């Protein structure tokens, strides 16, 4: 499957979802979901950001093999700054989410801002909206 070359940016404050191109230079240099998501995080967030503030980001990322038949290709990563340690926190999971995200046309979802109330992200193929 490789890369779809699309990043979904979800602004919870504005209630908007926008597609942007994947930084392919970073994708080549920081291969894999963890490396690429971490690169996006450190480039976009102030190192002193409060983990519980609207300025912190939450990044869901897939790798180039996600959704293929390769062994362990069902893995995907979540990166943010954790409130417990104040450091970058990384979680890795398996299952169908990563492959489904990739099949919908997205390599990564970046959540930013803070919503006024509870919302959820509805992804239907290449369309995404907050409800």
Kindly give the residue locations of the regions a language model identified:
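Acidic carboxylate diad motif detector
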Residues: 1-131
């Amino acid at each position: 499957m490789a890369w779809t070359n699309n990043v979904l940016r979800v602004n919870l404050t504005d209630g908007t979802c926008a597609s942007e191109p994947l930084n392919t230079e970073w994708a080549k240099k920081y291969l894999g979901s963890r490396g690429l998501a971490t690169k996006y995080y450190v480039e976009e967030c102030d190192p002193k950001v409060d983990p519980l503030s609207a300025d912190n980001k939450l990044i869901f990322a897939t790798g180039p093999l996600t959704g293929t038949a390769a062994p362990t290709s069902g893995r995907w990563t979540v990166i943010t700054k954790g409130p417990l340690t104040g450091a970058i926190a990384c979680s890795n999971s398996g299952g169908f989410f990563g492959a489904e995200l990739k099949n919908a046309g997205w390599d990564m979802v970046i959540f930013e801002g803070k919503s006024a109330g509870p919302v959820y992200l509805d992804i239907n193929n290449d369309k995404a909206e907050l409800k």
